[in-house]
Regions:
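Short, solvent-exposed loop/turn segments at the edges of secondary structure
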Residues: 189, 260, 327, 405-409
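Hydrophobic membrane-insertion alpha-helices, especially the h-region
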Residues: 52-70
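Zymogen propeptides
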Residues: 65-79, 83-256
Length: 427
């Protein structure tokens, strides 16, 4: 065997070297080296493992936090689509998420920003618009708004012509709708306009699940089941409370304190509707059924507010997705007879929105919600199997059943009127 001395060879110092033993020395040294390297190899492997753990640990922590945070966020009750809800999670919960979302949206919207010119429309969209069933008597026709004067020299069929929606009330149309192209430079842009006869309608204001944040009575967060038999239309609310301290009230109870100087849409207990420049302090008076504020007035006494501007990141007129000046915008106005007008149009600045409201007859007006997700006007027909909702103006991000199920944001419901003082029915 290698590494063992054979007997009878004498002292190792005088013995001649055995050829068979000479390789045994490096072999023995090799074993010793191998035995000496084993602890070092384990230590190296441990060091590599520690480095990997140190590198991976932050990612594991962040991933674990993200999974928990996202799950908690997505499991909260909401009416938003999962993709929109996911975007809001990034914006609100992820560090620098607001910048990331804004930057991404800016790129997307810049690529799809409206361009001037282009081909003319051959017809106007008819989404949500029902043709008139019968000709109205001349006296009733005179009570409605005049045809919207077309902007284009060659108007399309039905452009600016008011059409009734839903069943008549007291022999006349409670709700009228029309469409028209508001700007020569943007021939494919369409404005959707709805007019509500204040003598044939009654309007209620409803808190949503999260807006206003401190609702005195949260209510059903949708059109109450017991009121749907008289439902005519629903539409979106204004800017959130955090975007301008926009207060609101229902049935004499303050949700969020009203702010002096804000434009305020008010429904009085006698059934009349008004837009006022609020100066009454944080609470409403006993004659007010409901109130909803949204920024400053954009039209006053028939004239545009001189402080209007096209800044897409204006703290006064609302931040837009992607920092674009032209986005979906909505607004409400009051005409000379005290009737309510609602407008929704894509590719609008706050100035062009005000001009649309001015053109359709508003003498006072205010901006409501903006950006693609929130504009919502829905009219209803009472069919044999219940309500048939129809979107007026396209919005693929919202279903026609919005407001028939609990919604995150506040909204308005338009009803056939009931006798007596107006209150907001929560049942």
């Amino acid at each position: 065997m290698r590494g063992l001395r054979r007997p009878g060879t004498g002292s190792g110092a005088n013995a001649p070297p055995d050829p068979d033993e000479s390789p045994g020395v490096p072999a023995s040294l090799g074993q010793g080296a191998a035995q000496g390297e084993q602890p070092g190899g384990l230590a190296a492997r441990r060091r590599r493992l520690r480095r990997r753990i140190v590198i991976a640990a932050p990612f594991v922590v962040v991933l674990s936090w993200g999974i928990v945070s996202y799950s908690v966020w997505m499991l909260q009750p909401t009416s938003m689509r999962w993709d929109a809800r996911s975007t809001e999670w990034v914006r609100n919960e992820v560090p620098f998420g607001n910048w990331v979302v804004d930057h991404g949206e800016s790129i997307d919207y810049s690529l799809n920003a409206p361009k001037t010119g282009g081909p003319q429309l051959k017809s106007l969209p008819t989404v949500g618009l029902n043709p008139p069933r019968t000709s109205l008597p001349r006296s009733q026709a005179a009570a409605g708004p005049p045809r919207v004067t077309p902007v284009f020299p060659h108007p399309l069929a039905g452009e600016g012509v008011w059409k009734p929606v839903g069943p008549p009330v007291d022999g006349g149309p409670p709700v009228l709708v029309t469409t028209f192209r508001p700007e020569l430079a943007y021939p494919q842009t369409v404005a959707y306009v709805t007019w509500f006869d204040h003598t044939r309608t009654e309007i209620g204001y409803y808190p949503g699940r999260y807006e206003p944040p401190a609702a005195a009575v949260r209510g059903p967060m949708m059109v109450p089941y017991d009121q749907r038999s008289r439902l005519l239309a629903t539409f979106n609310g204004g800017f959130t409370y955090t975007d301008g301290a926009n207060g609101s009230a229902d049935n004499g109870r303050t949700n969020e304190p009203l702010k002096d100087g804000n434009a305020t849409l008010i429904g009085y207990r006698d059934g009349s509707i008004a837009i006022v420049n609020w100066s009454g302090g944080p609470d409403v008076g006993p004659d007010v059924a409901w109130a909803r504020q949204s920024l400053a007035p954009i039209i006053w006494n028939g004239q545009l507010n001189p402080q209007l501007d096209d800044n897409p990141n204006s703290p006064q007129w609302g931040y837009t997705l992607g920092g674009l000046a032209r986005v979906w915008r909505t607004g409400v106005g009051i005409d000379r007879r005290g009737n309510l007008i609602y407008v929704a149009a894509d590719d609008q600045t706050v100035i062009t929105l005000a001009k649309i409201l001015q053109r359709v007859g508003a003498v006072r007006a205010m901006e409501f919600d903006i950006n693609p997700e929130w504009h919502t006007l829905i009219t209803y027909i009472h069919g044999a199997n219940g309500l048939v909702p129809t979107m007026v103006g396209p919005n693929p991000l919202q279903p026609p059943t919005r407001y028939l199920v609990p919604d995150d944001r506040d909204f308005f419901a338009v009803y056939r009127p009931l006798p007596g003082p107006v209150t907001v029915p929560f049942k």
